[in-house]
Amino acid sequence: MKIRVERDVLAEAVAWVARSLPARPPAPVLAGLLLKAEDGALSFSSFDYEVSARVSVDAEVEEDGTVLVSGRLLADICRALPNRPVEISTDGVRATVVCGSSRFTLHTLPVEEYPALPQMPTATGTVPGEVFASAAAQVAIAAGRDDTLPVLTGVRIEIEGDTVTLASTDRYRFAVREFLWKPEDPDASAVALVPAKTLLDTAKALTSGDTVTLALSGSGAGEGLIGFEGAGRRTTTRLLEGDLPKYRTLFPTEFNSVAVIETAPFVEAVKRVALVAERNTPVRLSFEQGVLILEAGSSDDAQAVERVDAVLEGDDISIAFNPTFLLDGLSAIDSPAAQLSFTTSTKPALLSGRPAVDAEADDAYKYLIMPVRLSG
């Protein structure tokens, strides 16, 4: 194999594929990146039996070939190379990377032991890359981090015709985002549970493309597979077993109080007040006509109080939240104004965004957050 490729193109492609390399590969060859040169293109692939990634870039191919080298080492080398064209060639059990006056010789891994990557499933539909990335980020934030509860570490993707709904929960909050897309079949209907971290990493990586193709195969669980493709990059991941709890009935539709606050001063106030909130202690919010009073700490220890302008419709209400979960939600709505809707101080509150304080709420994204019960 002998090829020539631009340094920036090489570094970006290698970094993207190497991101999904396993920290503890189940077999030594799975720590490798597979490089394949043919027909004026150079492809890079990685696979750990769960997630596969592949990207193809234009290259001057002098000699076709395939080689398997240490992925992390190649990524480190590519990052450090000067901004000059890069030549990669193979000779027996060694691969050579030359860039300007830099020359690296790498030992190769046995290509014949590398597993075949799964085939990309048939395309189910397409969505703009920025919409997909935004939706994935808004929902993944509420997914669980506890691997002993694998179902809660996933994002549920539900497809019904031209609507896609993403949902996740860690039992303390529930995030749901809807968006429109272009299905291959107008009557498409499917449900899949995708690892949240994989979904988020993939969505971020595919924002550079105009559109992202989603492709589903299998039963939708366990042995099922989902694929994403865009901007010359494709990745597949096995689906998680199980499904999230039925959540639509958890979201209230009638409220006793609705408060609207400008997001930026609200976020800054929560951050300041939370400085005195010890680990796992809540921030208390008291809504009255025209004002929100935030408090944390106790009279026996450090204490903080702050007032923020707020518009309140309905009854006055006092409620407490985990400040991290509240800030996550305020970050995710990505709107100038935040709307908090309440039934009672002991029931979950619904957070959504508004383009302005006096505008209607955006129902495309909803963040349900459990309150913290206050002693006494």
Regions picked out by a protein language model, each given a short descriptive name:
Residues M1-G376:
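Structural preference for solvent-exposed beta-strand-turn elements
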